[in-house]
Amino acid sequence: MTGKFSAYAIALACVTGAAPALAQEGIVTDAGQQADRGQVIATFYYSNSTRGYDADGNTIDIADYEKVELFLLAEYAIAPDFTLLFKPSFRSVSVEGGDDDRGLGYTDIGGRYRFAGDQDGWLAAEATVRIPGVSRDDNLAQVGSTDAEYDLRLRGFRNLTFGSDTGFVDAQASYRLRAGDPPNEFHADLTLGYRPDPDFLLMAQSLNTISDGAGRGIFDEYRYHNVQLSGVYTVAPAVALQLGVMGTLGGENALRERGMFGGVWVSF
C-alpha cells in the first residue's frame, strides 16, 4: 500500500507500539544510587510525525500524528535483590482525519530480581503486567490500550570508569506477549551513561522494537529503532532534572517520530 491512506493505517497501528522506553525502565546511574531504597521518575514526552516508513523501510508521507505522554515510574526495593515496579501513564494522541484520544494509558506492575553480581555490575530478570487504560471501541486509534500485555525482560548493568570520571552501561532484552490482534514483540534497549561531573549525567539510548511476525486485522509485521539523547542535572541531594530529544532512525510499517522530553528524578 502507498499514499496517505495506508500511512494512516500505519499511524493507527503504531498507537499500540512502544511508548518511549528506557528512560522509564528504572535507570541506575551509579553504584551509590543503588543504596537508596527507591526512586520516582516523572517524565513528559512530546513527539510528532509527518512521515513514516513503509513495508520496505522507505519514508512516505502519512497523516500527521502528534502524541503527548506523561509517565510516572516508581521503584521500591523490598529486599537487597528484589525491587517492585509500578508505572502508570497518561497520553493524548491526535491523528489527522481521526478523533483525538486522551486518558489513562498502560499501567505497568511488576518486579525485578537481581540474580547475579554486586553493586558495580549485575544481571537481573524483570516481569511486568501491562494493564490497559481508557479505550473507545468506535475508533481504531484507541486499540493501543485495549488489551493486556506481559513483558519478560533480562537486564544487565555495569559501572564504568573513564579516568577520574564515571559512567555505566545498561543493556536490556525482552519478549512482550500481547493479547488481541497486535503481534508479540522483541525489544532490545541499550543505554550508555557518562558523568563528567558529579552533578551532571549524559545519556545516549538506543531503543529497538521488532514484531514477532504479523498480527491480525490491520497489524502487519513492523519494526522501529529510536534513539534518545539527554542530560540529567542534580539540583539537590535526592532530586535531578532531565532534558532530552528523541527520534526514529529507521523502521518498517512505522512512524518516523521526532520529539523532546523532560523529567524529574527523586530518590529516597
Q: Where are the regions that the model predicts?
A:
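Cleavable N-terminal export/targeting peptides
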Residues: 1-28, 32
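Transmembrane beta-barrel domains of Gram-negative outer membranes and organellar outer membranes
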Residues: 23-178, 187, 191-268
